[in-house]
């Protein structure tokens, strides 16, 4: 059974919890900005296809305490990234934090990117290309005061952009609002 985190706009967490429960999610835990839950890959696919409240579904990869950027690098370098995606895929690392004591989230992003690329180079002999605008794979790093969590984005584009229209009006609404 895999662990996931569904991101949603603040204030919709309880509704998202009920929506995920109706899809078959287990071990739900509501938090600010989203819901932690467990399930199989079928549930992940269903959540991506059927959720009207989530903006992204993230797949939990690893979590550990940290004191410096080097600890975060070591956590990311320990993961077997080639098992999760192919070296031919482009990638991007996104870092968010709450009460993080580190000075630069951009530096954390760079260190995680280096760890992923170093892991690929050591195990496959080459590294994935970085694409900031439209990557195939998004690695999400979430930092709290003393914990780092790594996720892979299973959604691609934000889910509120489903059915995104080429012709739009001046003030379109997000589809999940």
Label each PLM-derived region with a short phrase.
Residues 165-177:
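Conserved SAM-binding loop and adjacent beta-strand
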Residues 2-137, 145, 154-168:
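Accessory substrate-recognition/RNA-binding modules or partner subunits associated with SAM-dependent
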């Amino acid at each position: 059974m895999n662990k996931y985190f569904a991101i949603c706009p603040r204030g919709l967490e309880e509704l998202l919890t009920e929506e995920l429960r109706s899809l078959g999610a287990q071990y739900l835990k509501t938090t600010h900005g989203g819901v932690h839950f467990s399930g199989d890959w079928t549930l992940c696919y269903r959540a991506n296809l059927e959720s009207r409240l989530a903006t992204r579904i993230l797949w939990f990869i690893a979590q550990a305490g940290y004191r410096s950027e080097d600890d975060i690098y070591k956590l990311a370098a320990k993961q077997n990234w080639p098992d999760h995606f192919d070296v031919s895929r482009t990638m991007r690392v996104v870092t968010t934090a709450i009460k993080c004591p580190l000075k630069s989230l951009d530096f954390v992003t760079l260190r995680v990117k280096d760890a992923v690329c170093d892991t690929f180079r050591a195990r496959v002999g080459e590294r994935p290309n970085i694409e900031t605008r439209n990557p195939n794979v998004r690695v999400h790093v979430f930092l709290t005061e003393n914990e780092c969590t790594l996720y892979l984005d299973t959604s691609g584009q934000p889910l509120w952009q489903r059915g995104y229209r080429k012709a739009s009006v001046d003030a379109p609404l997000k589809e999940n609002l």
